[in-house]
Amino acid sequence: MADVLDEVYAVIADRKVNPKEGSYTTSLYNHRKGIDKVLEKIGEESTELIIAAKNGGEKEIVSECADLFFHAMVLLAAKDIPFEKIKEEFERRRK
């Protein structure tokens, strides 16, 4: 599973330095609100996950959780924080 997350993060980070027309990720980086747009999306996806957890089924929860993970990864890349740092933090907490 970590491999697919690494791959997704690599694409997200690449879109920052190599924008691609029509890319949703590129549109987040280039939004007129800047990082605030990414933060808005994180807030929105967090709320949607909470609602899915309260009222939805497994499929909705998984979908909203993936959306939240994705936008958190965009934030990391926007702030030049490697995804590896998150994995290291989980490793540290596991000990």
Swiss-Prot record:
Signal peptide: none
Compartments it resides in: Cytoplasm
Any GO BP: L-histidine biosynthetic process
Top enzyme category: hydrolase
Keyword terms of this UniProt record: Amino-acid biosynthesis, ATP-binding, Cytoplasm, Histidine biosynthesis, Hydrolase, Nucleotide-binding
Pfam families: PRA-PH
Gene Ontology molecular function terms on file: ATP binding; phosphoribosyl-ATP diphosphatase activity
InterPro entries cross-referenced by the UniProt entry: HisE (IPR008179), PRib-ATP_PPHydrolase-like (IPR021130)
Pathway where this protein functions: Amino-acid biosynthesis; L-histidine biosynthesis; L-histidine from 5-phospho-alpha-D-ribose 1-diphosphate: step 2/9
Catalytic activity line of the entry: 1-(5-phospho-beta-D-ribosyl)-ATP + H2O = 1-(5-phospho-beta-D-ribosyl)-5'-AMP + diphosphate + H(+)
Gene Ontology cellular-component annotations: cytoplasm
Highest taxon, organism lineage: Archaea
Keyword Hydrolase: yes
Keyword ATP-binding in record: yes
Enzyme Commission (EC) number: 3.6.1.31
Protein family (similarity comment): Belongs to the PRA-PH family.
PANTHER family listed in its UniProt record: HISTIDINE BIOSYNTHESIS BIFUNCTIONAL PROTEIN, HISTIDINE BIOSYNTHESIS BIFUNCTIONAL PROTEIN HISIE
Record protein name field: Phosphoribosyl-ATP pyrophosphatase
